[in-house]
Structures are given as structure tokens and as C-alpha cells.
């Protein structure tokens, strides 16, 4: 406790870090306040049925969690940040196939800015498609016509589309500003704060269900909390675990502050078991809405009914099989993008370092690629198992669905991953200013090895 108090005092003493944290908290507060602002012309009291259904889990529960309740509230942020996530998926997938995007990726900062601009425009396009679908879909979700105070007129639809698109763009802007001037990844923090906002209600509903319905009582609640803590610890291990590649140096003339300098200090290259972080989960979850949507296009046909029945139930067999497969695929895909083994090999060669038994240059790059493939496969399976664990606990012990979403799956992994990433950034600021960090001996040394 004394160490935590000392760390808080240290954070307060560092002006830049203090301002970054306050800036982040302020923008997160703006986002949460916006999630409570209902679209003009919509009666919030008439949305109670949609809100209660979304609290019970299912696709509605995930949508509502990702938007922090904005989806069920028909808020100006009802679309949340998911259109931006979807746009990022498309751009990164196209970056593998389109020469133009591949060229931009190699142009450094200027290319990154152009890719960001393309992602923004694609986000707007997705918003324009999703906004009317959301407005017309409210009736299918059980919202009565009386909820629309002035009726669902063309003027109301047009105005609401503009507001929803603007809300998504504003949320995207908030996320980018947090990343640039705050602490942590802004987009991930927006999703996390929305998920955390739904946690107390989900736990309360599960507690009431266990006690009032004689469904295990407090003993079962205690067991669930114990299992939850174990899953959190396993998730932390997944995020933090690294494979250490030993490095030897023939000479030590590395430039201070560079990646090669850091390698020289620690005498090994740390390759993370889950180098892609939470992004495979977010990407896979974004695509999991597609099968049910495609099924609705086919209407009452056999294919349409099967798609809607199989992929609208997030605790069902087919949904979780596809979800797990997508998590594995995106883990490999995103790791290939985010781990620049060629650059690591070049930096190592320039600093006079080499992996024992491996020639510097291309052979080292191929070796690092091989090791990454070896550790990414079990890491992706580990990630997929945790991702589908909510469905397992629902089927095995009959847990309340809204609370089960926090037993692994998208919600827990995002919260754990974002929390660790944010803590590591705060830790880096503290260590750079010669204060004791949040981790005993630095973020890299505290990681478990495999």
C-alpha cells in the first residue's frame, strides 16, 4: 500500500504524466456523458425493454457493452467505435493485397498519415450504412413506434443519421486525441470504459439470480469470483509471457536510446507469446456480427434461418467455433504485421549483435520468423480458449449470461490487455523520470518467460 501511495505521489510530481492522465480521464468522461444523451425525438422511457434484453447477453449484450450502454439507450454514440474498428480491419487486410497500401506502409510517417486518412473516410462510409440500419432495426428489436415522439419521418431519419455519423466521428477523434496526448491506446480505452460501465449491473443481476432463485446461493457466487480471478491471472500471463532469444555482441557501439541499445542492455530479444495483444479479439468480434446480418438478408429461407439461429446466440456451438477460428487467424495475421522481424534483424546487425549459431542478416530474420510462428500457434489457441470461455461457463454451471461475458471472451481480454498496456506506459514515464515504477524491476523484466 505504501508503494502504491509513493507511486501516486510520483505521478503527481511529473507534470507531463499528470497532464496526460487528467487529459485522458477528461475525454473518457466526455465519452461516457455522450453515451447517456438520447437521439432527439426518441422517448428514452420506451427503450426499457431493449435495455433489459441487452443486459442479458447475446449479440445485443456485446453491442451494448462495446458502446457502454449507448446502443440500448439510442444514444448519439449508439454506433460506438465499432465502425472505426471495422474500417481498420478492411484497410489492414487490403494492405496485404493492394500494392498502393503496401507502398504507403513503407513510406514511414507520411505513409502512416495517408493510411489513417483512408481509414477515417472508410469509417464515415460504414457509419452512413450502419446508421439507417440501426434506426430501422430498432423496431425489429422490440422498440415500439410510440418511442418515436414525432414518428419515424424522413426528416427524423435524415437528422438521426447525421447525428449518429457525427457521434462516431467524434468518438474516433476522442480516441485519437487520447492516443496522441493522453495515456494508453485511445480506441481501446473507449471500448474498455464502456465494458467496465456494464460490469456492476451484470454482477448484481447474477447475484440476485443466484440468491432469489435458490440457484447455488452465495457459495456459487464465491466460487464464480474465485474462477474469475483465476481467469484474470491466466489472461495476464497470456499478455505478459515472452520467449527470450539470447543475443551476443561482438562490439558495443549502439546508439543510446535506440532499439538496438535496449537489446544490448538486456542481452536477449523478447518475443511475446501474444504479440498482437487484444486486437485479434476485437477484429474477430467485429466480424461475428456478419453471419446473422447476412442471414437476415436471406429472410425466411432455410439458409437465412440457419444463419440467424446459429450466429445470433453468442453462447451457441457454431458461433463459438467460428469465433475461435477467427481469433486464431487474426492472431497470426496481426502478429505478422506488428512484429517487424526484418527490422529487428537489421538493428541487431548494425549494433554488432547476433543470435548464437545463426548468421546475421536474412538468416536471423528467418530464424526470428520461425520462432514467432512456433510461439504464436500455442498463443493463438490459448487466446481462442479464453475467448470462448464465457460459453463454456454458461453451459456448464448455468451462469447469468451478462455476467458470463466477463469470464474470458472479448470483455475480459480487452480489459486486461488495455490495463496492462496503460500501466506499462505509466511505468515507462516514471522510470524515464528516475522514479520507481509500478512494476518492481521494469516492465520487461517482470514478464514471465516461456
Give a label for each model feature.
Residues 1-105, 110-450:
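N-terminal cationic and glycine-rich segments that engage phosphates or anionic surfaces
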Amino acid at each position: 500500500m505504501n508503494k502504491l501511495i509513493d507511486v501516486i505521489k510520483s505521478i503527481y510530481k511529473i507534470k507531463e504524466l499528470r497532464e496526460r492522465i487528467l487529459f485522458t480521464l477528461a475525454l473518457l468522461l466526455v465519452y461516457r456523458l455522450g453515451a447517456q444523451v438520447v437521439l432527439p425525438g426518441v422517448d428514452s422511457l420506451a427503450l426499457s425493454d431493449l435495455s433489459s434484453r441487452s443486459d442479458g447477453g447475446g449479440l445485443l449484450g456485446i453491442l451494448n457493452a462495446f458502446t457502454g450502454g449507448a446502443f440500448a439507450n439510442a444514444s448519439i454514440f449508439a454506433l460506438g467505435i465499432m465502425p472505426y474498428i471495422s474500417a481498420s480491419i478492411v484497410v489492414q487486410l487490403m494492405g496485404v493485397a493492394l500494392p498502393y497500401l503496401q507502398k504507403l506502409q513503407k513510406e514511414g510517417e507520411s505513409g502512416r498519415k495517408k493510411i489513417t486518412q483512408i481509414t477515417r473516410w472508410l469509417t464515415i462510409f460504414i457509419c452512413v450504412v450502419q446508421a439507417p440500419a440501426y434506426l430501422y432495426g430498432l423496431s425489429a428489436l422490440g422498440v415500439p413506434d410510440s418511442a418515436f415522439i414525432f414518428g419515424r419521418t424522413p426528416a427524423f431519419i435524415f437528422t438521426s443519421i447525421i447525428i449518429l455519423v457525427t457521434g462516431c466521428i467524434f468518438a474516433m477523434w476522442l480516441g485519437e486525441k487520447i492516443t496522441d496526448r493522453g495515456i494508453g491506446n485511445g480506441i481501446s480505452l473507449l471500448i474498455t470504459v464502456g465494458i467496465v460501465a456494464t460490469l456492476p449491473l451484470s454482477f448484481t443481476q447474477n447475484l440476485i439470480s443466484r440468491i432469489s432463485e435458490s440457484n447455488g446461493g452465495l457459495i456459487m457466487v464465491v466460487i464464480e469470483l474465485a474462477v474469475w480471478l483465476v481467469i484474470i491471472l491466466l489472461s495476464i500471463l497470456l499478455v505478459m509471457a515472452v520467449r527470450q532469444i539470447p543475443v551476443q555482441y561482438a562490439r558495443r557501439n549502439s546508439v543510446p536510446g535506440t532499439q538496438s541499445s535496449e537489446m544490448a542492455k538486456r542481452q536477449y530479444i523478447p518475443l511475446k507469446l501474444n504479440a498482437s495483444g487484444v486486437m485479434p479479439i476485437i477484429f474477430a468480434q467485429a466480424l461475428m456480427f456478419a453471419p446473422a446480418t447476412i442471414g437476415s438478408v436471406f429472410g425466411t429461407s432455410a439458409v437465412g434461418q440457419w444463419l440467424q439461429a446459429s450466429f445470433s446466440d453468442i453462447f451457441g456451438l457454431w458461433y463459438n467455433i467460428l469465433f475461435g477460428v477467427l481469433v486464431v487467424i487474426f492472431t497470426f495475421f496481426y502478429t505478422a504485421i506488428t512484429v517487424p522481424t526484418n527490422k529487428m534483424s537489421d538493428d541487431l546487425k548494425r549494433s554488432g549483435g547476433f543470435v548464437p549459431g545463426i548468421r546475421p542478416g536474412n538468416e536471423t530474420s528467418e530464424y526470428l520468423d520461425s520462432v514467432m510462428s512456433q510461439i504464436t500457434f500455442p498463443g493463438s489457441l490459448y487466446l481462442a480458449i479464453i475467448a470462448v470461455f464465457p460459453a463454456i461457463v454458461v453451459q456448464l454451471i448455468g451462469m447469468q449470461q451478462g455476467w458470463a461475458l466477463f469470464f474470458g471472451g472479448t470483455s475480459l481480454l480487452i480489459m486486461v490487455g488495455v490495463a496492462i498496456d496503460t500501466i506499462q506506459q505509466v511505468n515507462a514515464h516514471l522510470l524515464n523520470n528516475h522514479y520507481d515504477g509500478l512494476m518492481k524491476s521494469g516492465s520487461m523484466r517482470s514478464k514471465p518467460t516461456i
